[in-house]
Amino acid sequence: MGRHGSRWSRPPCFRVLRLWTYAHRCDLGHTDPLSRRTEMTTTERPTTMCEAFQRTAVMDPDAVALRTPGGNQTMTWRDYAAQVRRVAAGLAGLGVRRGDTVSLMMANRIEFYPLDVGAQHVGATSFSVYNTLPAEQLTYVFDNAGTKVVICEQQYVDRVRASGVPIEHIVCVDGAPPARSR
């Protein structure tokens, strides 16, 4: 099926985000769903990955969710969920909606996971782009995917821009994107 003519009626996480936001009167950027622990039931099976993520974060918030090789960096489910909420709110603020595409282009780093899951929580499709691709191949990847937002490291911004694809937003995880050279 085509990029927007999907066979799915809604991306899996969209339903959960609406439920989470409206049913609990939760603002993505300001409310801690972990404080609603008693309202959630754990006897029902989650129906989406986003629901499973939120449920896990609520059930065992202090457990380690992510650990880098060697254990130099860790992230608890509480911190992971908080970062996912901030990312989802930020992407929503940029106008990212259900069906949009967010491309992630960075070296291996723990920040990748909240970015990826945060995009899914607003109903976007997120995917990782090989950071070794030349601009010509990025042109195909971004254009074919209909990329609206690229989240990357500063070192990749020039290559993203050189792709020539009209990307609405470039977000750098390690600072502001360098100004366009004229």
UniProtKB/Swiss-Prot annotation:
Source organism, top-level taxon: Bacteria
Alphabetical list of Pfam families matching this protein: AMP-binding (PF00501)
Name of the protein in question: Uncharacterized protein MT1599.1
The organism of origin for this protein: Mycobacterium tuberculosis (strain CDC 1551 / Oshkosh)
